[in-house]
Design a protein with these regions (language model features):
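N-terminal redox-cofactor-binding region of secreted/periplasmic oxidoreductases
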Residues: 2-589
Length: 589
């Protein structure tokens, strides 16, 4: 019923041009589904007095672990609600960002980046929500404003990403493991194609034009290509779907339940304090507690449990229990640039009216999903370019056949937190005149800039401090400018010119003191238009045996604590040369 209402109302309101009303209705429907799931989850789940294992988080890694773990006496905890069927429609991705299905984290103000964003903050990805309070025992705990695309639902961030399946190369991981045997086991995941649910997605003329232009510049078909997506019959297929399809639902699963603290007994992780349905409950595990709460969530949970840098914990009023200096450190993220940088002379038939047209909807639900743009995950082509470093690739290019002006400024500009003045000066004229913009993002795969995550207070419900230190390395800025220069070469090739692709000639606000197209101008542009690609890693770094340099050993056991593991993207010592979702699966394996 919700799906029928969704498409019928969307079709009506977008056809008559009421973008804001259409997005508002979509938001209301997702909220109704959210609260329906929440009310359903309020029915008490019978819980065992003790479990073999408790998995904290049902995202990419957590759901994979749950589907593979041999024990049946397992509890899976999820802070958000269960997902709904509309989440399986890939094109609805932007509508989920900034909703109750998203943690909505926000970074600290960035001195060297995000100059075009409000308060120089990067939203990961979406806007503020009103403070609310929940009753937990005798306490009133505020939920502070936060934003960042980090999935808060069964399926985790895999529900909110572009579904690109990256087949990693061994060269990316050679320094991660102390023993060659451990690296061999890790690489088996990719070499044996343990994740088989991948398909080529919907594409427009733009993706083909960029790929063909790259061929003319001498790049190979293994460098620019249409990516594989984690879909099944055109629908989003996550590790949570896989978990359920394998019949592992014998495990207990508790949603809308936030872990407050890990309780240690003589150095052994035995208990969790969890807020669920307005109550504080205690859960016990006899063999292990596995943190799979993500790069922000896992580090934050360790810190608020007293596991982390002693002095920093004491500063915010948390009693240190295990001194692990590297918890929350080593934060790395893929960043890109280039929204509304390219204009296109031809329509790609991705106007909202085209998307919700009955024939397009019918194709998706009748099995002709590859002909329906509803199966489109956002990215229709990728490219990988080496700048001469030791890595396989230094830059990635993501080809997106739309821009921030595609919805008339109703929703997308809020996702990236654009300043109102910047929108009115640079973006709104494109929207007002009907010019079409597309996006080809140069993305820095191995940034030198490194940040950290910390606690704001001893209150576990307060949003964490997230400071990625974007573009504090001048080398990062230079490499992104090189990416823009490569993009200029691509747009000058015949396949791109036939589509009418050209660079936006309007100087970007705040950069007009520099000559347009000079390196100094593009350096200013990169520092202004700085986009997270939503791939943070590294805050619970794994590796060697020294607790001073890493958080866990290569077998994912937290140093100084028995029966406590971290198994998600937070353990990655460095960023892979591509989208890390598949790497998180391999960590779970």
């Amino acid at each position: 019923l919700a799906a029928v209402m969704f498409f019928a109302l969307f079709n009506f309101y977008f056809t008559v041009g009421f973008y804001a009303v259409g997005v508002f209705i979509a938001s209301c429907i997702f909220k109704l589904l959210f609260y329906a799931a929440y009310l359903n989850d309020l029915h008490s789940t019978p819980l065992d007095s003790v479990y073999d294992y408790i998995i904290v988080g049902s995202g990419t890694a957590g759901s994979w672990i749950a589907s593979r773990i041999p024990s049946n006496n397992v509890l899976v905890l999820e802070a958000g609600p269960d997902r709904n069927a509309l989440m399986d429609v890939p094109l609805f991705l932007p509508l989920l960002q900034g909703t109750q299905y998203d943690w909505q984290y926000v970074t600290e103000p960035q001195a060297e980046a995000c100059w075009a964003m409000k308060e120089n903050r990067s939203r990961w990805p979406m806007g503020k929500r009103k403070e609310k309070k929940v009753h937990l025992d005798a306490r009133l705990i505020p939920f502070n404003n936060r934003a960042f695309v980090s999935g808060k639902t069964v399926g985790g961030t895999h529900i909110l990403n572009n579904m690109i399946h990256f087949k990693a190369e061994r060269k990316d991981f050679t320094g991660w493991f102390g023993k060659a045997h451990d690296l061999d086991r890790f690489m088996e995941f990719f070499e044996r194609d343990r994740w088989s649910h991948v398909e080529r997605g919907y594409s427009t003329q733009l993706g083909h034009a960029i790929i063909d232009s790259a061929m003319l510049l001498g790049f190979g078909r293994d460098e620019f290509f249409q990516p594989l997506l984690t879909t099944r019959n055109g629908r989003r297929w996550t590790t949570a779907h896989e978990y359920e399809s394998r019949g592992r639902l014998a495990h207990d699963r508790l949603t809308n339940s936030v872990v407050e603290r890990i309780v240690l007994e003589k150095g052994v992780a035995k208990r969790l304090l969890v807020s669920s349905a307005g109550k504080l409950i205690e859960l016990r595990a006899s063999k292990g507690i596995i943190l799979a709460a993500g790069t922000v969530g896992s580090a934050k949970l360790l810190l608020q449990s007293g596991i982390g840098p002693r002095e920093e914990l004491e500063t915010v009023g948390v009693t240190p229990i295990i001194n692990l200096p590297q918890v929350g450190k080593n934060l790395q993220d893929h960043i890109g640039t280039g929204s509304e940088l390219l204009l296109i002379g031809k329509s790609l038939k991705l106007h909202p009216i085209d998307l919700v047209h009955p024939s397009n909807v019918l194709k998706f639900f009748s099995g002709n999903h590859h002909q329906s743009s509803l199966s489109f995950g956002g990215c229709e082509a990728v490219g990988y370019v080496s700048l001469g470093s030791n890595y396989t690739s230094d830059l990635q290019f993501m080809v997106l056949p739309a821009g921030l002006t595609s919805d008339g400024g109703v929703h997308l500009r809020n996702i990236v937190n654009l300043k109102d003045a910047v929108w009115k000066d640079y973006y709104e004229p494109l929207s007002r005149t009907g010019q079409h913009a597309v996006t080809v993002l140069p993305i820095l795969l191995h940034p030198k800039s490194v940040g950290h995550i910390g606690l704001r207070s001893a209150n576990g419900q307060d949003a964490p401090i997230i400071n990625p230190n974007y573009l504090t390395s001048k080398e990062d800025v230079r490499d992104l400018v090189k990416g823009i220069r490569i993009l200029q070469q691509l747009t000058q090739q015949p396949p791109a010119r036939q589509l009418g692709l050209e660079f936006n000639p309007k100087p970007f606000p705040g950069c007009t003191t520099q000559p347009y197209d000079s390196d100094a101008y593009w350096e200013c542009y990169v520092r202004s238009v700085t986009h997270t690609i939503y791939h943070p890693v590294g805050t619970c770094r794994m590796g060697g045996t020294s607790a001073d340099s890493v958080v866990s050993s290569s077998d994912l056991r937290v140093h100084g604590v028995q029966n406590l593991f971290v198994a998600d993207a937070s353990v990655l010592p460095s960023l892979p040369s591509g989208n890390p979702n598949s790497v998180a699966m391999a960590i779970g394996e």
